[in-house]
């Protein structure tokens, strides 16, 4: 808490779990024991009891990360967002699941998957940084059932000596998903040979405009696919923004009813839209 307050002078309140006497000894009025702060809150519902939502930032693939601002959902806190139900079914989440996150939580995908696991009453294990053998050891030690990786992590796992790869029991794995970058066909073939047909893939963006997904069987039948469209409507345009026929290479655009804008950046917001909005 001391480091957080000294590093971020504009922070107005720092809640400390199990703070107690240490918080009082610290003497900074911004530093408050969590239990004391909770006890001071009224137990009556507030007038406008709607669920909030985080403002996620893009990963910065095309430049600096951009804040993605959406209208607040009109959901009471007791009801999960529709996206939760969608991903919960797609990712085969369940009570007692054990999720391993090898990626940082400032990215939307790991953050969403961690939240899904917690909301299902599951256990979450978070790596401070990815190490391929340490990852395998964590899967075995915690009997991990669900995890998400990126293709680079697949490649690093496959580069481990065969003896190291066989050293760990990975039989608890039920659902492995990857995204974020194109996965070379030989890499994915080797991963399916190693872990079995439990590897899923999706294509999307932090903006949440559209979503495609496929399982191992679908991918093996159409190697290189990122699956069928499950959210949004997909269009393929040429450089002149003319829609192209099926099977023609071009730029992918998603048509969606989900509004968003880039925080404090109307120019980037306009660039992200086609001429008809």
What are these regions (language model features)?
Residues 36, 54-56, 119-120, 144-149, ...:
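Gly/Ser/Thr-rich phosphate-binding loop
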Residues 55-70:
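Conserved adenylation A10 loop of the ANL superfamily
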Residues 73-98, 102, 106-146, 160:
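Conserved AMP-binding/adenylation subdomain of ANL enzymes
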């Amino acid at each position: 808490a001391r480091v957080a307050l000294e590093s971020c002078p504009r922070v107005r309140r720092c809640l400390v779990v199990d703070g107690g006497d240490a918080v009082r000894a610290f003497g900074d009025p911004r530093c408050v024991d969590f239990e004391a702060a909770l006890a001071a809150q009224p137990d009556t519902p507030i007038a406008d009891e709607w669920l909030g939502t985080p403002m996620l930032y893009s990963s910065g693939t095309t430049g600096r990360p951009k804040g993605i601002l959406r209208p607040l959902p009109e959901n009471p806190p007791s009801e999960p967002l529709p996206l939760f139900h969608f991903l919960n079914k797609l990712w085969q989440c369940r009570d007692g699941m054990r999720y391993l996150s090898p990626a940082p939580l400032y990215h939307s995908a790991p953050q969403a998957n961690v939240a899904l696991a917690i909301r299902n009453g599951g256990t979450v294990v978070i790596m401070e940084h990815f190490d391929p053998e340490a990852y395998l050891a964590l899967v075995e030690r915690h009997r991990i059932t669900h995890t998400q990786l990126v293709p680079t992590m697949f490649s690093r796992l496959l580069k481990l000596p065969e003896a190291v790869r066989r050293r760990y029991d990975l039989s608890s794995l039920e659902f492995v998903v990857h995204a974020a970058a194109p996965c070379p066909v030989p890499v994915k073939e080797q991963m399916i040979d190693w872990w079995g047909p439990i590897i899923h893939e999706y294509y999307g963006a932090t903006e949440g405009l559209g979503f495609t997904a496929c399982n191992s069987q679908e991918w093996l039948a159409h190697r290189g696919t990122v699956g069928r469209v499950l959210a949004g409507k997909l269009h393929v345009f040429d450089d002149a923004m003319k829609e192209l026929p099926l099977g023609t290479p071009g730029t992918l655009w998603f048509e969606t009813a989900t509004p968003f804008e880039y925080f404090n950046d109307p120019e980037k917001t306009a660039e992200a839209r086609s001429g008809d909005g």
